[in-house]
Amino acid sequence: MGNNATTSNKKVDAAETVKEFLEQAKEEFEDKWRRNPTNTAALDDFERIKTLGTGSFGRVMIVQHKPTKDYYAMKILDKQKVVKLKQVEHTLNEKRILQAIQFPFLVSLRYHFKDNSNLYMVLEYVPGGEMFSHLRKVGRFSEPHSRFYAAQIVLAFEYLHYLDLIYRDLKPENLLIDSQGYLKVTDFGFAKRVKGRTWTLCGTPEYLAPEIILSKGYNKAVDWWALGVLVYEMAAGYPPFFADQPIQIYEKIVSGKVRFPSHFGSDLKDLLRNLLQVDLTKRYGNLKAGVNDIKNQKWFASTDWIAIFQKKIEAPFIPRCKGPGDTSNFDDYEEEALRISSTEKCAKEFAEF
C-alpha cells in the first residue's frame, strides 16, 4: 500500500508543479501578447546564407547575425503574396503568438521586422532538420522512439492550450529535431488565440479532424486528433487516413474507422482509438480530466513527464551536426535574389507587424 500512496502523492505534487508553471507562463504570455512590439532588427544585421525551405508566399533561409555571429532561421514573407492568398490575419497571428511564447519544445522568435516588400521573422535555427526526412529515411520509429516525441508534443499542446492557443498544423514536416535530439515545433502560420470555437478550414488533409471537415465550429480538441494521426504515422511509417485525392481522405476521416498494423501494441492502439475519436464527447484531451487522460494512459506509463520537460532523458536519436551553422540535414533549394521595392507595399495590412 505504501508504494501506491507515494506514487499518488508524487502525482499530486507533479500536478501542483505543472499548475504553478502554467499560471506563471500565462502571466508572461499575456504581458508579451499585449505589448506586441514591432521592428526589433533590420535586414542589414544579417548575412543570408542558404535557403532551407520554400512555401507559397515566402522562404526560410539560414542567416548569420553579424553583431553576434549567431545562426538563425529567417522566414521571409512577400507581403503582396500574403494579401493575395488571404493570409494577412494568419500571418499577424503567427508573429504575435511567436513573440509571446516560450517553451522548450516550441521554436522561439528572436527578431522581426519588415521593409517595403517583405515581412521577416528571425527564429532560432534548429540544425537537425525535419522529423519528416528522418522518418522517411528509417521507414518508421519504434514505439519507445515515437513515445519520446509524442510526450514532447503533449507537453507543448498542454502549454499552448492553457494560453488559449490552438496550433492546427501538426505534421512531421513542422517538427524540427535539435542538436540534443529533442523536438521543436515550428510554423505557427495557422495558430490562433481562441477562447471558444473557431470555424476556419485550415491544416493538412491527412491531419484534419472530422469536425473541421464537416464545417462545424471546433476547438482545441482538433490538436489532440492531430496528435493521434502523428503518433500513428511515427509508429507505422504512414498516416492512418490516406488516399490520392483529399476528398477520399476526408471520407475516411469522417467514417471513424481506423485500421492498425499488426505490430502495434495494445496500449498504443487504445491510445489511438481515444485520440482518433470522432465523437468529441469521448475524445481524450477534450474530457473533464483534460490532458491528464492522455498523460495517464497506459502507453505513457513509463514516461517521466518532468524529466522530458527538463530534457534529462537521453534522446533515442541524435542528428548528425557538424556545427551550429550546419545545413546538411536540410534539402537543397534553388536560390533566388531578394527583390525589395522602392515603394512601400501593403502598409495598412501589416501596420502592427
UniProtKB/Swiss-Prot annotation:
More abundant in adult head than adult body. One of its GO terms (cellular component) is cAMP-dependent protein kinase complex. Transmembrane segments: none annotated. It comes from the Eukaryota. A lipid is attached at G2 (N-myristoyl glycine). Activated by cAMP. InterPro entries: AGC-kinase_C, Kinase-like_dom_sf, Prot_kinase_dom, Protein_kinase_ATP_BS, Ser/Thr_kinase_AS, STKc_PKA. SUPFAM superfamilies: Protein kinase-like (PK-like). GO terms for biological process: anesthesia-resistant memory; anterior/posterior pattern specification, imaginal disc; cAMP-mediated signaling; cellular response to ethanol; imaginal disc-derived wing morphogenesis; modulation of chemical synaptic transmission; negative regulation of mitochondrial DNA replication; negative regulation of nucleocytoplasmic transport. Signal peptide: none annotated. ATP binds at L52, G53, T54, G55, S56, F57, G58, R59, V60, K75. Gene3D superfamilies: Phosphorylase Kinase, domain 1, Transferase(Phosphotransferase) domain 1. One of its GO terms (molecular function) is protein serine kinase activity. Keywords: ATP-binding, cAMP, Kinase, Lipoprotein, Myristate, Nucleotide-binding, Phosphoprotein, Serine/threonine-protein kinase, Transferase. The active site is at D169 (proton acceptor). Residues 46-300 form the Protein kinase domain. Its EC number is 2.7.11.11. It catalyses: L-seryl-[protein] + ATP = O-phospho-L-seryl-[protein] + ADP + H(+); L-threonyl-[protein] + ATP = O-phospho-L-threonyl-[protein] + ADP + H(+). The keyword Plastid does not apply. It holds the Pfam family Pkinase. Residues 301-353 form the AGC-kinase C-terminal domain. Belongs to the protein kinase superfamily. AGC Ser/Thr protein kinase family. cAMP subfamily. Serine/threonine-protein kinase involved in memory formation. Promotes long-term memory by phosphorylating meng and by regulating CrebB protein stability and activity. As part of ethanol response in the glia, mediates ethanol-induced structural remodeling of actin cytoskeleton and perineurial membrane topology when anchored to the membrane. Composed of two regulatory chains and two catalytic chains. This is cAMP-dependent protein kinase catalytic subunit 1.
